[in-house]
């Protein structure tokens, strides 16, 4: 199977209306924002999308809507299997695949319980692959409900199937990512989720970025991905700025992203299902996001020099 585009893939948020329905107009506007700022793809129906708090119908509708809004301008990948049983997960993944996404994303922690072995994960992974044929897959080390990092044994098993296009890595460890890149040897793409290590992992062969901060300033991450070899000194300086700016990830995500989107002229409620935005995104958090917006403008002007 072919590869998805390398580059920057925001982990897309899900906007909600005041009465707790998906805000489809805002969904379309977010996709336009990603396209305008040069994103190579979108990871829809992920943890940042609050997928564990979406109904099955909402997950399927969201994947389909993002595919339609992207209109071939960007790759769209999506997950959405949150059930406990593999049978139910297969049903969920089949429905996501039918929306026309470029790849369906498995979640490592859904394939085996925390106390179960890699052999269980691999067996369940193969069951899914057999039940959902002719569909390209990715694998996501989703932190919720527990983070299950992919071992070399699992990575090799994935590569041997020939069905996996990419990994959304969340180990946040540059050394481990370099080891994974060497093990995979081009058989599966690897997308880093961590700004602080992004540049280092690009140099070691990673294929792109898929993380929270691509919701704020994807164009800066796109610049780094496309120019780190041509302008290494400037890339190093930009990497340092992005690393510090990424500290806002702790400011009440995903409410903070929704607040930032409003500042950019994309209106939406701050309402979230996975957190209480009123208590988890406070006055100081808003101040930090206000300052981030200023910093983004400063960095963009600096890049033009």
Task: Annotate each PLM feature.
Residues 50-51, 112-113, 175, 199, ...:
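Short secondary-structure capping/turn micro-motifs that flank functional sites
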Residues 7-13, 37, 217-305:
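C-terminal alpha-helical cap/extension of soluble enzyme domains
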Residues 26, 58, 120, 172, ...:
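Soluble or luminal CAZymes and related metallo-dependent hydrolases
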Residues 127-132, 142-251:
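Catalytic alpha/beta core domains of metabolic enzymes, predominantly
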Residues 2-149, 300-303:
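Active-site beta->alpha loop and helix N-cap motifs at the rims of alpha/beta catalytic domains
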Residues 55, 151, 279-282:
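Ser/Thr-centered flexible coil motifs
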